[in-house]
Amino acid sequence: MKALILVGGFGTRLRPLTLSKPKPIVEFANKAMILHQIEALCKIGVNEVVLAVNYRPQLMSQYLEPYEKKLGIKISYSHETVPLGTAGPLALARDLLNDGEPFFVLNSDIICDFPFADLLAFHKSHGGEGTIMVTKVEEPSKYGVVVYKEENGQILKFVEKPQVYVGNKINAGVYIFNPTILDRIQPKPTSIEKEIFPAMAADSQLYCMQLEGFWMDVGQPKDFLSGMGLYLNSLKSKQPELLATGNGIIGPVLIDPSSVIEPGCLIGPNVTIGPNCVIQEGTRLVNTTVLEGTTIGKNSWIKSTIIGWNSSIGKWVRMENTSVLGEDVHVSDELYINGGKILPHKSITSSIPEPEIIM
């Protein structure tokens, strides 16, 4: 089987992290976002993944090359010279995808349990051309809502940001299609959600399966941190042995074994610490991601923050309110950062009391 992952654009919503790396290889819970998806696909027998890329494909290729051998999977690249939306990439990759079998399509920003085996079985059971996963949301008026027959999952229509309640299930960004869908799509900028799916629904060829468990589009910092908490809580119930325990840990917390946590720290809940980090004594971390090679000074207090690679945070620093530090950022002692977005290679010597982008 094959799968296409829509890697797409420039990752502007997750800047400044994506100024250093393409978004799919930014680490989410100490693993590149896209590896969460590729590993799940491998488990159900997918043997080739096609990445639809148009931004820094060489970095993606260099990063993922070792994983082809490690995971026993072929990773191919379909290069867009111009952005083709969410459907055009399928037509561009037609020759790679069309082998007579159903294939998966994923948005690269999605984190969930990826129940691909269940999705494949349901798709084969109804005989339609396509199946999309849907997830339940609390405020459907913010989304495009999927309206479908409860008894068999056949999709009737899509309603964009409904002001009157029509349902609470939305497109979760994970699909499986028969190759015949490729006859509907031209290699030009096309929206699969707004152009292709309504046509398939009108032909009674599109079905949906509800996703059980957590789901999040982690393409922007606030959702990245929320998704991290959901993911860690899922690990807590399914693979608790991967999580940190002991004095000073309020789980769930994920810490790379190469990192050093000095005495007197209080870490968690919902914290990930990447490789080769040092968290000095007396530091408090909550709802925070610390990426590889970072040092945090003594007695700092950090909440709802993403700290980029190889950064250094001084002593008695306070950061909060979805602050995001790019790669190689240096923060002096005794500063306050409130919602700051700091570009790579910056030295911060004064506080940022209000949300601000530091160029």
Curated annotation (Swiss-Prot):
Pathway, per record: Nucleotide-sugar biosynthesis; GDP-alpha-D-mannose biosynthesis; GDP-alpha-D-mannose from alpha-D-mannose 1-phosphate (GTP route): step 1/1
Active site annotation, chain numbering: K161
Enzyme class, first EC level, given as a word: transferase
Activity regulation info: Enzyme activity is reduced by incorporation into the GMPPA-GMPPB mannose-1-phosphate guanylyltransferase complex. Allosterically inhibited, when part of the GMPPA-GMPPB complex, by GDP-alpha-D-mannose binding to GMPPA.
Reaction(s) catalysed (UniProt annotation): alpha-D-mannose 1-phosphate + GTP + H(+) = GDP-alpha-D-mannose + diphosphate
Domain of life: Eukaryota
Residues reported in the UniProt entry to bind GDP-alpha-D-mannose: D109, D217
GO MF, one annotated term: mannose-1-phosphate guanylyltransferase (GTP) activity
One biological process term in Gene Ontology: GDP-mannose biosynthetic process
CC cofactor note: Coordinates binding with substrate and required for enzymatic activity.
One cellular component (GO) term of this entry: cytoplasm
Keyword vocabulary terms for this entry: GTP-binding, Magnesium, Metal-binding, Nucleotide-binding, Nucleotidyltransferase, Transferase
EC number: 2.7.7.13
Name this protein carries in UniProt: Mannose-1-phosphate guanylyltransferase catalytic subunit beta
The gene coding this protein: gmppB
